[in-house]
């Protein structure tokens, strides 16, 4: 995929002379483990710093999903109000705030970036540090062991994976549950989601690969679920106790085998699909080059789309984000495409809106149709070119 800037390296409009650093993205398949890995690692302190822009708390769909996770965890594991719940990579504390709303007060976030300050809004304890074996020892000493440990869209970002898992093992109770939720290899391939391959995402896991990995550190799988969140997610529950697996586990493993995740030809077809989409999208833009075209929503994955489909930046006038986003008044990394408030969309109605958060295409397009964009054509670049007139 060449060299690309970091997806979250947004440049303030007032600092437009600053240049982004480009890093390679090259994805490798491990046939034995059945997962994908970026062969270049950018340091954590570069990726996750005080200027990190992503906040789940400003997205209703994300908040709703995290509320569901909190509800299910409490119900399925008979969680008591005094049981310690630790969320690693807790960002602005949104997931933990859902536990608190449901009556659970013994909560701890672990967050290395500047978003940790938002835990204060919920009056939730937070450790402003990277999670590893060393920081886990401090957590264990001060807070004790956890009944529930969650990592939502964090595990695939982890650099020193062995040290991270050892840290989990150090702070989890014997009867505790470790919940991993991440983008899912099968859905990435099935839905042509090359946009998940940004520098923060070091690995893309199948269920088979997660089981194999966690068993090396003494964890047993208990439950596994897949969902359509973020274009396709997998949620896996591990414990230190030897337990009977949920029937879901073997069902998902059989689906992975039937799909061909262990067959290199599956990935060659995936690559071919992406190139076809690239051609179709270019032809669409070129045909409509006289139209007023904007992008809508800028999750990290959108940077990959814009750079791999490099012609897009020549057609898009700006990217619209919701008014509360920290990304407004910044440029898309490596471009002069400005991220502006979506309030502008009703003043300057676009002919075409390219929804870069394509996994929310139906929700976003319908919302803006109802808001007054009656004549706008809504476009999704993935999983294949889709146009809603």
Language model segments and positions:
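N-terminal juxtadomain amphipathic helix
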Residues: 1-60, 225
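Class I SAM-dependent methyltransferase SAM/SAH-binding core
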Residues: 93-134, 315-330
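A short glycine-rich, Lys/Arg-flanked "PGG" loop and its adjoining helix->strand segment in the class I
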Residues: 162-177
């Amino acid at each position: 995929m060449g060299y690309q800037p970091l997806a979250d390296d947004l440049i303030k409009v007032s600092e437009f002379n600053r240049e982004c650093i480009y890093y390679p993205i090259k994805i490798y398949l491990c046939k034995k483990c059945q997962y994908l890995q970026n062969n270049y690692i950018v340091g954590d302190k570069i990726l996750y710093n005080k200027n990190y822009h992503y906040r789940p708390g400003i997205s209703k769909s994300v908040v709703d999903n995290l509320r569901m996770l909190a509800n299910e965890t409490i119900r399925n594991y008979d969680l008591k109000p005094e049981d310690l719940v630790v969320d690693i990579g807790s960002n602005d504390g949104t997931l933990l705030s859902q536990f608190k709303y449901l009556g659970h007060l013994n909560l701890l976030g672990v967050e290395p970036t500047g978003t940790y300050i938002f835990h204060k809004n919920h009056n939730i304890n937070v450790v402003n540090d990277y999670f590893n074996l060393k920081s886990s020892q401090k957590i264990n000493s001060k807070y004790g062991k956890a009944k529930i440990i969650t990592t939502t869209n964090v595990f695939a970002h982890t650099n020193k994976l062995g040290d991270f898992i050892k840290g989990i093992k150090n702070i989890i109770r014997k009867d505790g549950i470790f919940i991993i939720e991440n983008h899912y290899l099968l859905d990435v391939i099935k839905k042509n989601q090359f946009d998940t391959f940004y520098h923060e995402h070091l690995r893309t896991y199948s269920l088979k690969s997660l089981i194999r990995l966690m068993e090396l550190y003494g964890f047993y799988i208990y439950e596994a679920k897949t969902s359509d969140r973020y274009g396709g997610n997998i949620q896996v529950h591990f414990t230190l106790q030897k337990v009977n697996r949920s029937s879901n586990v073997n069902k998902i493993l059989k689906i992975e085998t039937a799909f061909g995740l262990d067959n290199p030809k599956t990935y060659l077809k995936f690559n071919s699909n992406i190139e076809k989409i690239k051609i179709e999208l270019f032809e669409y833009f070129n045909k409509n080059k006289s139209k007023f075209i904007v992008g809508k929503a800028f999750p990290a994955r959108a940077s990959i789309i814009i750079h791999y489909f490099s012609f897009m930046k020549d057609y898009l006038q700006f990217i619209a984000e919701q008014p509360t986003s920290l990304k407004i008044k910044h440029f898309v990394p490596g471009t002069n495409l400005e991220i502006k408030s979506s309030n502008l969309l009703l003043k300057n109605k676009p002919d075409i809106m390219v929804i870069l958060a394509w996994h929310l295409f139906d929700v976003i397009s319908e919302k803006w149709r109802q808001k007054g964009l009656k004549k706008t054509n809504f476009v999704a670049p993935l999983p294949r070119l889709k146009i809603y007139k």
